[in-house]
């Protein structure tokens, strides 16, 4: 039987249940609570209180998301786009990417080693194939170019 979210307590409990599983951004949490039938005024009040109590934090969510996606092999371009689509502020996204402490060149090199066994492309077709894969994963074209020309990774 579905939970009815018609009281502040029910909305808060559901929000806390979602936050207990993983970090969420305010926009994402609002969307999930609306999908469950909570009225907007109860959602706003509950989320404001969670922010005041330090239980809901955009910066913690950004840090968690960037770290998770980087560990999954995705680069800064892709992560930035995913966060934009989730409705987060561009300045906050840029700050999170700057402060994450991730060496994107090293991550790119690790992904390339894992996928292509460290084999530099021998012809234009192979270079394009490797470049497409790495670009799709969200790495900047200048980094990819340096790596595939043999000048990246070990600078």
UniProtKB/Swiss-Prot annotation:
**A single cellular component GO annotation:** cytoplasm
Q: Which Gene3D superfamilies match?
A: Winged helix-like DNA-binding domain superfamily/Winged helix DNA-binding domain (1.10.10.10)
Read off the HAMAP family from this record.
RecX
Gene symbol of the encoding locus: recX
Q: Which residues form a coiled coil?
A: none
What the entry lists under InterPro entries is as follows:
RecX_HTH_1st, RecX_HTH_2nd, RecX_HTH_3rd, Regulatory_RecX, WH-like_DNA-bd_sf
Pfam families in the cross-refs: RecX_HTH1, RecX_HTH2, RecX_HTH3
Q: Does the keyword Metal-binding apply?
A: no
BP-aspect Gene Ontology terms:
regulation of DNA repair
This chain's protein is named Regulatory protein RecX
Superkingdom in the source lineage: Bacteria
Please classify the protein's predominant subcellular localization into one broad category: cytoplasm
Function description: Modulates RecA activity.
Compartment annotation: Cytoplasm
